[in-house]
């Protein structure tokens, strides 16, 4: 019993050398079965015939033995060491089968009898492949997995094939995307270049604008249109209403270069339309004639003006019925008579100095009872 316990202790002490043993020196499956039988027969204690674990046997041996150091024999080490190594390998194979059943992976093991040596090798390769897949999916496709005794896993060839397909697909997709990007850049550069050429051709220079403004002013005056007529005609024809000030500043080259470039084509179209319709009444002539609906300057005859002046001396501010009757008698419009009286009163105010009277006002209004009250002239009523 002491010899068995000492052998067990030596077994636990030499665990590190057993773990790092070379996989190439493993024996066949039949020797593993004999070793397992031998281990079970050696490790069976008086506990209902069940084999105990290594740790439990070591603890039992320590509890039953004395504190003296155990003696070891080279013969016992030679007999037990292969047995323990074979038992550890058998436990590793069973753990691999359990790991395979718990965590299935992409690589499938080879089909066949699992009781032979080939089955053990396929199981080991499956274990290594599953470790590679658990560490990272890229390892499964990037490089083949080598197993015990230098054998290549059957699934590694398929992984290499998938790697090639993936690379070819990526290369094809990358080339296709690169071609699309290059074509898009080429089209963008062509459009940009065409836009630049087009803008360079359409953009006039400062000399062109100056020459066009001078010609436009001469032709406008020759055709008989004012600057206000041109601005109104542009608004009616093209939808852009421009004021007289804008047209004047264009002719004087006082607008910005950008605004001059925008206004030049519109004025050029208006000139072409005006030249083509010169000598015949067209829509431009009608629009220019309408203008801003300014009223004509009324010219009053001398006889009519004298009658209005005599009436103003009598009543500088007539009422609405008096204006209507006077307009009918003189054959004038009511609005013309009203405006004339307004202008005449404003003229009278300008002629009267502040706080004084007009020289000779006594002679003018002396015999008249219709003296304007604002002159302050007192006359006796006859």
Swiss-Prot record:
Keyword annotations from UniProtKB, A to Z: Developmental protein, DNA-binding, Homeobox, Nucleus, Transcription, Transcription regulation
GO molecular function terms listed in the Swiss-Prot or TrEMBL record: DNA-binding transcription factor activity, RNA polymerase II-specific; RNA polymerase II cis-regulatory region sequence-specific DNA binding
Biased segments, Basic and acidic residues type: 165-178
Tissue expression remark: Expressed in the developing brain and spinal cord. Also found in a restricted region of the auditory vesicle during development. In the adult, expression is restricted to the brain.
Record protein name field: POU domain, class 3, transcription factor 2-A
Gene3D superfamilies: Homeodomain-like, lambda repressor-like DNA-binding domains
Species this protein is from: Xenopus laevis (African clawed frog)
One Pfam family of this chain: Homeodomain
Record carries keyword NADP: no
CDD domains: homeodomain
Subcellular location: Nucleus
UniProt-annotated stretches for the region Disordered: 69-136, 150-206, 348-382
